[in-house]
Regions:
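Short periplasmic/luminal acceptor-recognition loop of GT-C membrane glycosyltransferases, typified by
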Residues: 377-415, 433, 437-445
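Transmembrane-helix motifs of polytopic, lipid-linked glycan transferases
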Residues: 93-113
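Transmembrane catalytic cores of multi-pass membrane glycosyltransferases
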Residues: 33-36, 48-53, 181-286
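Membrane-interface transmembrane helices that cradle and orient dolichyl/undecaprenyl
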Residues: 150-166, 200, 282-290
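Membrane-interface alpha helices of multi-pass inner-membrane proteins
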Residues: 24, 127-131, 153, 166-183, ...
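Short acidic/glycine- and proline-prone juxtamembrane loop motifs at membrane-interface regions
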Residues: 134-142
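Signature aromatic-anchored transmembrane alpha helix within multi-pass, membrane-resident enzymes
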Residues: 224-225, 322, 329-354
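Transmembrane-helix signature of polytopic, membrane-embedded enzymes
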Residues: 106-129, 144
Length: 475
């Protein structure tokens, strides 16, 4: 009897929880293998086994021993722990452990507004597909959750001066500086934004801003200052404070790494991002409520980040998830609403179940097969040339690399030279002589393959079924 009363009283909460959790499981069909994941995992396993925090390179023959800004060290340890517990299922477990709490946070913060317009909630939660682009076991998924908490705490205090949640932001900052230091500046950056806007008081056509109390202004400013200090609580100290700005200021790195590329109208795969922008703009324009200036600024900042780099569209979705429901009016339920939610949730869950074997295969799939790896280990190269995207898998297999996904590490040493060599640009032959490679692991995706193929000084000693070739340099 008590159970029936509980179910009746909390019917829509239970339906939404079922829908959100099943949707997150359905999202796992987008999980994939990622080269960077493999060096994150290897670093994490090393730190767990040796009870240390890596701060100098141990994976490359070229930059071995050089200082490495391991700004994601704690994420790597966590990934290593997930691997030790879940084995080949660790990527799925890692993604679910972060995606489910994030979506539940969005639900519980907006619960009353969600219940007043369930159809819109269905549309919005379906748009979590924007989070699917980089669904793999990497530190940015932890950043997604930390960003959600940051925006929630700040907005909650902005609307409610008695809220105490904002005082958790320094702790969030410390966690961020160790899980994913490249984004650890966001708590104080957003706090400064809230501080500035708290002074504004105007009402102009569709946009308004209401001045906040002196106490709120002081708290926003103090939280920003404390968060600035907290960024430095990490194994690298003050270097972490300036790291995000140095990293984002590296134009060569930003322009050559695919996940950092700009959003482009000429790329059909980016169309959904522009549809998302239009969708939110229509919500603002058609809403009967005035647009709060703080919401507009958060929207514009998040859009700027997304347009600057496709990897930041997840940030846009997360930030707007704590804003958009305010502008949606109530809608009367029809008798089919709950059946739609339950039906879709069941479909997502069945999709996950039936695709499970393929998902597991995809998240453990490697570009370089075992035969090729064994051949490299057999020849024991001292100065192997490898492609940037293959470095993670080679590190995972205990093979020393010339370069890998840690572009921030290599940018001071050989990153530009690698780019020129791989595409046979500029004085690439002099660069090849400079590094004295003894073996080359390549495929036909880069111009360097054509050069090796047509040069008598390079002998092909292996061709793998995976499309990889090993060339040996012979004088």
């Amino acid at each position: 009897m008590k159970i029936k009363r509980f179910i009746k009283k909390n019917k829509y909460d239970l339906i939404f929880l079922f829908f959100i959790i099943c949707s997150c499981f359905g999202m796992m069909i987008f999980t994939r293998s990622d080269s960077d994941h493999f060096w994150h995992l290897t670093a994490g396993k090393y730190m767990l086994e040796n009870h240390t925090i890596l701060s100098h390179d141990i994976f490359s023959w070229f930059v071995n021993g050089k200082y490495w800004m391991s700004h994601e060290w704690l994420s790597e340890v966590v990934i290593g722990i997930f691997y030790n517990i879940f084995g080949k299922y660790h990527v799925i477990a890692f993604c679910l452990s972060l995606l489910v709490p994030l979506m539940l946070l969005i639900y519980f913060v907006n619960k009353d507004k969600i219940h007043s317009n369930k159809l819109f909630a269905l549309i919005w939660f379906t748009m979590m597909l924007l989070l699917s682009s980089f669904m793999t076991a990497r530190p940015h998924l932890i950043s997604n959750l930390l960003l959600g908490l940051t925006i929630y705490f700040l907005l909650d205090y902005y609307d409610n001066p008695d809220s105490k949640k904002i005082y958790f932001l320094p702790l969030i900052t410390i966690l961020w500086a160790n899980f994913h230091g490249g984004s650890s500046n966001l708590p104080y950056v957003f706090s400064i934004l809230f501080f500035i806007i708290s002074f504004m008081d105007f009402n102009y056509t569709k946009i308004e801003s209401k001045e906040k109390t002196i106490k709120q202004r002081i708290v926003f400013l103090l939280i920003a200052l404390v968060c600035m200090l907290c960024v430095n609580i990490n194994p690298h100290g003050f270097k972490m404070f300036i790291y995000p700005y140095i990293n984002m200021g590296n134009s060569l790195m930003i322009s050559t790494i695919s996940e950092w590329r700009n959003t482009s109208l000429s790329d059909n795969s980016h169309l959904m991002y522009y549809i998302f922008i239009f969708f939110i703009l229509m919500i603002f324009i058609l809403s009967k409520k005035k647009i709060r200036f703080i919401d507009l600024m958060l929207f514009l900042i998040s859009i700027y980040l997304g347009l600057k780099s496709i990897r930041f569209w997840s940030y846009t979705y997360i930030i707007m998830s704590f804003i958009v429901f305010y502008y949606i009016g109530a809608r009367k339920d029809d008798k089919f609403t709950e059946f739609i939610f339950i039906g879709l949730a069941s479909l997502y869950l069945l999709l996950f179940i039936f695709a499970f074997d393929r998902i597991v295969t995809n998240v453990n799939k490697k570009r370089i097969n075992a035969e090729t790896i064994n051949k490299i280990k057999e020849i024991k190269p001292d100065r192997l040339f490898n492609l940037y995207g293959d470095g993670g898998e080679l590190i995972y297999n205990n093979i020393k690399v010339f370069i890998d996904g840690r572009a921030d590490l290599y940018s001071d040493y050989n990153y530009k030279d690698y780019i020129d060599i791989s595409i046979c640009h500029s004085e690439y032959e002099k660069l090849i002589s400079k590094y004295k490679f003894d073996y080359y692991l390549v495929n036909d995706s880069q111009q360097i393959f054509i050069y090796l193929k047509n040069n008598e000084h390079y002998k092909p000693i292996y061709k793998g079924k995976d499309g990889y070739y090993i060339y040996k340099y012979e004088k």
